[in-house]
Amino acid sequence: MSGEGPPVNGRELLRIFVPLECPVCGGVPFDGSPNMLCRECLAGIRFLKGPYCPGCGGEHKGFLAMCPECLSAGKKKRWDGAVAAFAMTGMIKELLHSCKYQGQPELARVIGDLAFMAASDRLPEADCIVPVPLHWRRMLRRGFNQSQYIAERLSVHMGIPCERLLKRVRYTGQQAKLGRADRIANLSGAFSVPDSTNVKNRAILLVDDVMTTGSTLSAAAQALKRAGAGAVYVFCAARRQRI
């Protein structure tokens, strides 16, 4: 019929019935997608730029094989490769703080989508994605695990399952104010794998929201390796480098 227009796709219908807006300021999303920031808020994010350190995924422009922080850690990191999306500063720092401490779990999904957009070309091939778990006491207080939400968004984009294969069996308290040695000691025996048959010989992408020294990810990766994982790669949305 001559009066018919072009077909309306799902995104256009969503725009009609549920107007999309930047989850931070309410402005117009950069590309009209759900979970997307506006142009101004995106400008406040510092995306990590290569070359990248293979040990932690952070920026590394020196002539050495890894960044000084990873070299000083020696063989304490238990993973096979690392990817990071953002520097822990500016808008990403604000988003993570609001997510974790102001009860806004939806922001973790925003971060997950942005992180995939930033690092999709660096993500390794994996059989599944595993979020770093919270201890039940912290989960009870916060009500959600931000790393789980980030991992779920990566799962959607990468087309591989997100599986809860790790359990945090020991409460470790706050890590943020501890030095490297204290962090490592604090995390000893903190993680376990309840069913090793789900891990054996699989390549796993281990996901956390922030990496500082890498102690939490190292302890979690070690538990997966001991349970028989073929390879463990780590992904953090934000990298806090001390150099």
PLM feature spans:
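Glycine-rich phosphate/pyrophosphate-handling loop used in enzymes and phosphotransfer proteins
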Residues: 1-207, 212-243
